[in-house]
């Protein structure tokens, strides 16, 4: 990864920190990347850069105005070329605050352990919505306005922030994708999905399947009861219910 020298404008586009230990040979935090191994990689001059996923995907420094402006240019490029909108992967992971002493106290990838007040150092910070408000202004320059949906694994009381009209406008509701073909489980997912959109004014989203879960046709056909007719009923009912409801359904096509 070529980023010039410490303190350079090029390096400031990313998140670099000095390491721990007498020689700085230990990562700045104890975090693991999403795909395993340390979330930090050391460069020859001794500093470490943050990558919440693979080392080939260094995290951007969203406090850098140049980074933000470049993304606005990219959004314009694709919308000018006919894109209808964007699925924003890991939408909760842009803004970060690493200038604190308690970083090792936080679990990075466990949603249930995340605070619900926007104070986690790297996940679902309040500042991320400043970024999306800028994006929304770009989306609204087009007629009709560009569509966007957040893939954001955040606490339920934080979901509406991503779905608000001045933000991305939609957020994936993954509860549907996590439920089995069981009456009470499906009922809970539907009721919670409808309730969650009342605060944002958005429409409900039903994620039936994506690349992280078993396809819905297979999942609803799993042998929870021993009759093939019941399995087919589950598949047909889910599609009819979801596709005819006041919502935006999402499914895996590839």
Residue ranges and their predicted role:
Residues 1-254:
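Active-site and adjacent substrate-binding regions of carbohydrate-active enzymes
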